[in-house]
Amino acid sequence: MAGKEEIIAKAKDSITEFDEEMAQEAANEALVAGLDPVEIIEHGYTAGMQYVGDQFEQGTLFLPHVLAAAEAMKAGIEVLQPEMEKRKAKTTTLGTVIIGTIEGDIHSIGKDIVASMLNIAGFEVVDLGRDVAIKTFVEKAKELKPDIVATSALMTTTMVNQIQLEEQLKEAGIRGQVKTMVGGAPVTQGWADKIGADIYGESATDAVNKIKAAIKS
């Protein structure tokens, strides 16, 4: 039987090699070995995704590579999902997070990773998908009364819609009842401060840690 480090390395390699089958194999090996799915995802898949993201930023990999890596990660997580749900059922939910890619933006890679990691961390995650209308975020926030409403923007042209969300949550009279988080490649702490968002998620891990801290406070 493969050891823990070996399985984690295989999970990471499956992402950097864009290999969905290998990602599923690593996940199955992890389950057989009784490993914690969170470890496999954080140290294996997410570490691989981080590497791919860095290479993409440096211009050595391109969008099709990032998409292929994201598909491999998705394939691996799907295998681990039932075990994660089982473990999650035994623990209390930390809070509810509504997440989606903002209106006009069809990119979902970063958002998908954050949603997966929040799920793993023990949050109830309502993923609205990509290119989500502002009014949908507001309606869902009214209906579900979440702790956090998180939006991702991958383009400077769609970032402005994060301002619209802040405004419309205020108009609906619920801005004071939820905390907002913004993230995405062009988004910065300065932007979050400027529009009045509560949290800026620089990376998936950063987003999870800050959401945990925000809910405790």
From Swiss-Prot:
Protein name, as recorded: Trimethylamine corrinoid protein 2
Residue stretches making up the B12-binding N-terminal domain: 1-92
UniProt KW Metal-binding keyword: yes
Pathway: One-carbon metabolism; methanogenesis from trimethylamine
Domain B12-binding: 94-217
InterPro entries hit by this protein: Cbl-bd_cap, Cobalamin-bd, Cobalamin-bd_sf, Corrinoid_p, Met_Synthase/Corrinoid, Meth_synthase_dom
Quaternary structure annotation from Swiss-Prot or TrEMBL: Can form a complex with MttB.
Keywords, comma-separated and alphabetical: Cobalt, Metal-binding, Methanogenesis, Repeat
SUPFAM superfamilies assigned to the protein according to its UniProt record, in alphabetical order: Cobalamin (vitamin B12)-binding domain, Methionine synthase domain
Gene Ontology biological process terms from the UniProt entry: methanogenesis
Family: Belongs to the methylamine corrinoid protein family.
GO MF annotation, one: methyltransferase activity
